[in-house]
């Protein structure tokens, strides 16, 4: 679903070029420079525990598709999921991307431009999987030979951790360390795992 890492794929029937960001991050990055940082207590991680979900948004990696992102934090376990859809109401699922991480810990508190606070974090990759939910997705990804796979089938996940895919985009290997940053504003969460000095513009709402 994931990124969350951008890949370029050629959509054979429409010649649409897009990058598969979810597995690294489907997030539109809003550049915010860090002015200062300090150590942060690991107990602060409790403030983001639970499930966070986005609205139905246009997928950044494929402008004719839509996505709902879900983040679930439980202790040091972190799940990031991207449900990809054909339609703007996000009712016709195309495929699901799921990244699982472990050993989540906070490293530094940061102050962004404007004075808002955030926290940098680190975690380890457990898995990064794609799950085809439609025959169209199976056909598309087999035709693309994405990540070297040409044997996708319905409802059978494939893990692409540590593989170079698309436009020479490499995905972190299992057990690799991923670093990111988040900013919490009451029940809204801005987060990215592709930078430690800027947060995404995609808003996650606490469920």
Q: Where are the predicted features?
A:
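N-terminal cationic leader/targeting segments used for protein routing and processing
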Residues: 3-4, 32, 180, 184
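Contiguous, well-ordered beta-strand patches that form the walls/edges
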Residues: 55-64, 79-186, 195-200, 205-207
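Short N-terminal edge-element motif at the start of the domain
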Residues: 35-89
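Bacterial Sec-dependent N-terminal signal peptides
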Residues: 16-47
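Non-cytosolic coordination micro-motifs
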Residues: 190
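Sec-dependent bacterial lipoprotein signal peptides
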Residues: 1-18
């Amino acid at each position: 679903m994931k990124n969350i890492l951008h890949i370029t794929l050629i959509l054979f029937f429409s010649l649409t070029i897009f990058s598969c960001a979810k597995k690294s991050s489907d997030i539109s990055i809003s550049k915010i420079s860090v002015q200062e940082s300090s150590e942060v207590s690991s107990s602060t991680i409790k403030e983001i525990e639970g499930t966070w979900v986005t609205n139905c948004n246009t997928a950044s990696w494929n402008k004719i598709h839509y996505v709902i992102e879900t983040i679930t934090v439980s202790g040091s376990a972190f799940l990031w999921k991207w449900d990809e859809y054909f339609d703007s109401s996000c009712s016709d699922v195309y495929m699901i991307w799921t990244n699982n991480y472990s050993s989540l810990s906070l490293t530094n508190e940061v102050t962004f431009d404007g004075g808002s606070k955030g926290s940098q974090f680190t975690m380890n990759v457990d898995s990064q999987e794609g799950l085809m939910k439609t025959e169209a997705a199976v056909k598309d990804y087999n035709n693309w030979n994405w990540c070297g796979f040409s044997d996708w089938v319905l409802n059978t996940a494939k893990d692409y951790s540590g593989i170079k895919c698309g436009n020479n985009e490499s995905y972190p290997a299992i057990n690799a360390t991923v670093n990111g940053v988040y900013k919490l504003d009451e029940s809204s969460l801005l987060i990215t795992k592709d930078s430690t000095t800027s947060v995404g513009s995609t808003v996650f709402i606490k469920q």
